[in-house]
């Protein structure tokens, strides 16, 4: 079988047989794939370090009939320390759950991979997890084609909106004339902040700051909209609310 080299971050792990794991890995070349890490649970396995969630590695893999399997692997960067802090474990788990939910298997999306790596790095360096989460929510909507229309009214295309509303049904802004009963009013400051996040390069995400009140206002839009897009609840958020 031909050996293939790729880089990727481990999203999830499932124990397989007595000493192996099935890993869900987001790779740069093949998107989200499942990979067999054979005998990685043995005490002296050379694959054990690269067979845990939050590990960004270079993998040498081969494609068998039904699944990829790891031939060798080396760690590029470890985000494992995030799992050792309860709050950071939840926030990093939230980002990973979003990635896993938005991407189908073998759906290549290098932007999402870079977004995840940058966001985990920001968490690792101590940036406010709530700010990182809002940035991530907006960016992943952009990179997966579900971004909200925030530059004009989704119905009449008017751009000079002085009083803005948000339509979950239509996925964007509505003006005062076009708004419907269930549309919620949002401040222009919120609209501007979201557009700044959209326009900011991934390498400059660390420069974005959001006051707590502004962050919460953005959350009232992004969380329900993501739930509507995915048509399911994000499970880890329920646990987060429980421990708070």
From Swiss-Prot:
Domain of life: Bacteria
A GO CC annotation given for this chain: bacterial nucleoid
GO biological-process terms attached to the record: DNA recombination; double-strand break repair
Statement: the UniProt record of this protein carries the keyword DNA damage: yes
Keyword Ligase attributed: no
Family matches, as InterPro entries: ARFGAP/RecO (IPR037278), DNA_rep/recomb_RecO_N (IPR022572), NA-bd_OB-fold (IPR012340), RecO (IPR003717), RecO_C (IPR042242)
Keywords tagged on the record: DNA damage, DNA recombination, DNA repair
Family classification: Belongs to the RecO family.
Function noted in UniProt: Involved in DNA repair and RecF pathway recombination.
HAMAP family: RecO
Name by which UniProt lists this protein: DNA repair protein RecO
Species for this entry: Caldicellulosiruptor bescii (strain ATCC BAA-1888 / DSM 6725 / KCTC 15123 / Z-1320)
Lineage: Bacteria, Bacillati, Bacillota, Bacillota incertae sedis, Caldicellulosiruptorales
């Amino acid at each position: 079988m031909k050996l293939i080299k790729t880089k990727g971050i481990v999203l999830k792990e499932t124990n397989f047989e007595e000493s192996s794991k099935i890993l869900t890995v987001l790779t740069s070349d093949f998107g989200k794939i499942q990979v067999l890490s054979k005998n990685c649970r043995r005490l002296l396995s050379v694959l054990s370090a690269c067979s845990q969630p939050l590990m960004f590695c270079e993998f040498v893999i081969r494609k068998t009939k039904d699944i990829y399997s790891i031939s060798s692997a080396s760690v590029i960067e470890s985000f494992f320390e995030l799992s050792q802090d309860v709050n950071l474990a939840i926030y990093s788990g939230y980002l990973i759950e979003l990635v896993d939910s938005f991407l189908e298997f073998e759906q290549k999306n290098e932007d999402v991979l870079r977004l995840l790596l940058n966001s985990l790095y920001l968490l690792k360096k101590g940036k406010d997890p709530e700010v990182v989460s809002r940035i991530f929510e907006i960016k992943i909507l952009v990179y997966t084609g579900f971004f909200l229309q925030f530059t004009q009214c989704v119905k009449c295309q008017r751009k000079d909106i002085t009083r803005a509303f948000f339509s979950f049904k239509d996925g964007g802004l509505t003006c005062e004339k076009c708004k419907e009963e269930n549309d919620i009013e949002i401040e222009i400051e919120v609209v501007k902040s979201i557009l700044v996040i959209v326009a900011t390069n991934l390498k400059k995400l660390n420069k974005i700051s959001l006051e707590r009140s502004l962050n919460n206002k953005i959350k009232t839009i992004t969380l329900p909209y993501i739930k509507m897009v995915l048509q399911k609840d994000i499970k880890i958020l329920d646990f987060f609310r429980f421990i708070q």
